[in-house]
Amino acid sequence: MSRFFRRRKYCRFTAEGVEFIDYKDLNTLKNYITETGKIVPSRITGTSARYQRQLATAVKRARYLALLPYCDNH
């Protein structure tokens, strides 16, 4: 038996009843990108496929409008 009990991942957007992920909501988007600027995969965050697609589109739009960086500050 494993020593740890791993908590089941769940989609935060489904639980909160979010209709659409907005690209202007930077606080939410920053939780789903790494410090190097990559989009975190759904197998790590637990986000459902529908919201992962919306999340990727929102991050890409925010990057295009220079609201989020494409990469880290190096």
UniProtKB/Swiss-Prot annotation:
GO terms for cellular component: cytosolic small ribosomal subunit. The lineage of its organism: Bacteria, Pseudomonadati, Pseudomonadota, Gammaproteobacteria, Chromatiales. One of its GO terms (molecular function) is structural constituent of ribosome. GO terms for biological process: translation. The gene is rpsR. InterPro entries: Ribosomal_bS18, Ribosomal_bS18_CS, Ribosomal_bS18_sf. This is Small ribosomal subunit protein bS18. It comes from Thioalkalivibrio sulfidiphilus (strain HL-EbGR7). Binds as a heterodimer with protein bS6 to the central domain of the 16S rRNA, where it helps stabilize the platform of the 30S subunit. Belongs to the bacterial ribosomal protein bS18 family. Part of the 30S ribosomal subunit. Forms a tight heterodimer with protein bS6. It comes from the Bacteria.
